[in-house]
Amino acid sequence: MTFCDSSFLLALLLPGDFFHTPAAAVASRFRESIPFTPLAELEVTNTLRRALRERVITRMEHDAAFRQIEADLADGILRWSDAPQSELYRIARELSRRHTPEIAARSLDILQTASAFVIGAGTLCSFDERQRRLAAATGLKVLPRSMPRGSGPGR
């Protein structure tokens, strides 16, 4: 199973995102639904709302992304996946203890990686460098294998 963090999901949802093309290329090889946890929903939808407020995206892009989420859920591209909170936070605390001193992992990185473990994912897709380092340090396979080159945003 493949878990996609918010940087990857947002790249899929926003055609103008620097990472949209590589995200679409990776996702085209998926053979099962993308797990969509409550944390992923909150992070993706809040980021879209913030991007609209900060005029990073237009109202049309914002609304299209929300419609796409609903369509992807209805079509089974995204699948609601619950990560029980007690297990999520138990794993997150352990990841923090083991990896933050070396990687300087942020809480969101830790929670997304813990989510991948709780739902049984063996792969994590991300365009966030710190998230990628943490996932790799925990033994998860990380996609895309390398980061696209260019002037993408520092995530």
Which ranges hold each PLM region?
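Acidic, PIN/NYN-like endoribonuclease modules and their adjacent C-terminal/linker elements
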Residues: 1, 71, 98, 113-155
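Short, well-structured N-terminal submotif of metal-dependent ribonuclease cores
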Residues: 1-42, 47, 51-64, 129, ...
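A short, N-terminal amphipathic alpha-helix
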Residues: 26-30, 74, 118
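Active-site-proximal, substrate-binding regions of enzyme catalytic domains
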Residues: 39, 45-98, 137
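Active-site neighborhoods of divalent-metal-dependent phosphate/nucleic-acid chemistry enzymes
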Residues: 51, 77-133
